[in-house]
Design a protein with these regions (language model features):
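Long, intrinsically disordered low-complexity tandem-repeat regions
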Residues: 252, 258, 262, 274-275, ...
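Conserved hydrophobic beta-strand positions in leucine-rich repeat
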Residues: 175-177, 198-200, 221-223, 244-246, ...
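Leucine-rich solenoid repeat scaffolds
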Residues: 530-563
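N-terminal Skp1-binding subsegment of the F-box domain
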Residues: 2-38
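Leucine-rich repeat
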Residues: 168-169, 191-194, 213-217, 236-240, ...
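The feature encodes a structural signal of leucine-rich repeats
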Residues: 162-164, 185-187, 208-210, 231-233, ...
Length: 563
């Protein structure tokens, strides 16, 4: 027999394909199938691999289909398409045999045409998924273990599912199908008509049946960690849906019918491939949480401003270059995450977010902040690390509830004196800027506990720093300090003091008053001696003095720290 070079898989007679499939599923049968072995290296198997990909992902290019198929079956990229097809067969047969052993003992009779071909691949896969679903339904064990049932072929068992659900599952309200190996959701799921919560996360779903829209009582639908490339328009029929979780899928767009989910409160879409949102997103009048982290959004529709109940909006790790002015209409918004985008400015309307408590803008390209930022009267956490800010507006001092302010890795050369008005501030991070001095007003931050000033260009500290009576951590490493003010000894709560890589030639005796100090870092300075008062630091655990020209260390200190 000559190798096949162009015949489609569907047209292969069962007599020809059967030995190939048997050989793939049961390697020991290779010995009796040598006469067919040449087919395994022909165009048959690679062609079958491509067509199986179309079964799972009907739309999209070949590369997308192959990518999804490889993820479903966890195939090694280094395998050829023919080898991948064989691996798919083997896994499918193994699973099918575990579900309905009588169906796949490989005692096939050619004349009965009982063969696993591409023509019936979709229906065969459906019956595997039917049995996977069935095994998660309560009360199924006794029925499936009946002699007359368990020896039926897989297809015959699968055909019984609908009737069994109609008879036994009317009152099921919660169904957990997570991590059971589903490659698609059997349409019989719609027969569980009272279902309120459905969890089908951590499977290999590439699509949802249109029948999903018939679950009229469904309130929570969790589909995280699948391979979904699209949603059916029927999703909009879930009129009672309150929570929809679609994290970690392959979605590139949302159907406009998403706007029909009038009761939806929480929508999770992080780690997909969305490039835009439909304008109908603005119709979700009850939405409180919208998570779009780690997508490919380049802009937001102006209709986003219609989400009048929205409290949490997560947009980290997208490609946003600007925000629409309408974002200021989100009057109930409390949390706004915009880290790792490409924002160069914020709209002035940002100041209208009167309920905002957390604003995170790390790793953008902001060069300035609008003065309206001072209107955020409820703001408690403001994150601006890794931007290009050269100054702060004086209105920053109006943030009377601010507790944490992060400004590391910017280009700040000074701070406005209004910074001292932040009476609730507990954390101030200014490391890796270009500060040459600190204002005396820094001492007004009476609640400050953590102050990070490392990697700046400070040559001195104001005496007012001693007024920071609640300060616990003070990082000043990698500056140009030559001395410390004696007032540093007044920081009675200080536990960590990092002064590595400065130009200190001496320490004030008042350092011995830091009664709670535990860590003192003084590496790479110009110290020639230490004040004896260091010996009074009864809580000190770590003292680092490397790379100093020390000549005189009190014996008590030397013994205590094994110097």
């Amino acid at each position: 027999m000559h190798p096949i070079s162009s015949a489609s898989i569907e047209s292969l007679p069962n007599e020809l394909l059967l030995p190939i499939l048997e050989a793939c599923a049961v390697p020991s049968l290779f010995s009796v199938c040598k006469r067919w072995h040449h087919l395994l290296g022909s165009e048959v198997m690679p062609s079958l691999y491509k067509q199986i990909g179309k079964v799972h992902v009907s739309q999209g290019d070949i590369n997308k289909q192959a990518f999804i198929l490889d993820r479903i079956y966890k195939l090694d990229d280094r395998l050829s398409e023919g080898e991948k097809a064989k691996a798919i067969f083997k896994e499918a047969f193994t699973l099918a045999k575990s579900l309905a052993p009588a169906e796949l003992e490989f005692k096939w009779k050619t004349q009965e045409k009982r063969c696993f071909t591409l023509a019936n691949y979709a229906s065969y896969l459906l019956n595997i998924n039917r049995l996977l679903l069935w095994k998660k339904l309560p009360g199924r064990g006794e029925y499936l273990n009946q002699e007359k049932i368990k020896y039926l072929p897989l297809e015959k068992q699968g055909e019984l599912l609908r009737g069994w659900i109609e008879e036994n599952c009317k009152n099921i309200t919660i169904l957990d199908l997570s991590g059971v190996g589903l490659t698609y959701l059997p349409p019989e799921i719609c027969q569980v008509s009272q279902l309120q919560e459905l969890n089908s996360s951590q499977n290999q779903l590439t699509s949802l049946p249109t029948e999903i829209g018939q679950l009229s009582e469904l309130q929570d639908l969790s589909l995280n960690q699948n391979q979904l490339t699209s949603l059916p328009v029927e999703i909009g029929q879930l009129s009672q849906l309150q929570t929809l979780e679609l994290n970690r899928n392959q979605l590139t767009s949302l159907p406009i019918e998403i706007g029909q989910l009038s009761q939806l409160q929480d929508l999770f879409l992080n780690q997909n491939q969305l490039t835009s949102l439909p304008i109908e997103i603005g119709q979700l009048s009850q939405l409180q949480t919208l998570d779009l982290n780690q997508n490919q959004l380049t802009s937001l529709p102006t209709e986003i401003g219609q989400l009048s109940r929205l409290r949490v909006l997560c947009l980290n790790q997208n490609q946003l270059t600007s925000l629409p002015a309408e974002i200021g209409r989100l009057s109930q918004l409390q949390v706004l995450y915009l880290n790792q985008n490409q924002l160069t400015a914020l709209p002035t309307e940002i100041g209208q977010l009167s309920q905002l408590r957390t604003l995170s803008l790390n790793q953008n390209q902001l060069t300035h902040l609008p003065v309206e930022i001072g209107q955020l009267s409820q703001l408690q956490w403001l994150y601006l690390n890794q931007n290009q800010l050269t100054s702060l507006p004086i209105e920053i001092g109006q943030l009377s509830q601010l507790q944490e302010l992060y400004l590391s890795q910017n280009q700040l050369t000074s701070l406005p004196i209004e910074i001292g008005q932040l009476s609730q501030l507990r954390t101030l991070s200014l490391n890796q800027n270009q500060l040459t001095h600190l204002l005396a007003e820094i001492g007004q931050l009476s609640q400050l506990q953590w102050l990070y000033l490392n990697q700046n260009q400070l040559t001195s500290l104001p005496a007012e720093i001693g007024q920071l009576s609640q300060l616990q951590w003070l990082y000043l490493n990698q500056n140009q300090l030559t001395s410390l003010p004696g007032e540093i000894g007044k920081m009675s709560r200080l536990r960590r003091l990092n002064l590595n890589q400065n130009q200190l030639t001496n320490l004030p005796a008042e350092i011995g008053q830091l009664s709670e100090l535990q860590w003192l870092y003084l590496n790479q300075n110009q110290l020639t001696s230490l004040p004896g008062e260091i010996g009074q630091l009864s809580q000190l655990i770590i003292l680092k003095l490397a790379e100093n020209p020390l000549k005189d260390i009190a014996e008590k200190i030397r013994q205590r720290f094994q110097l």
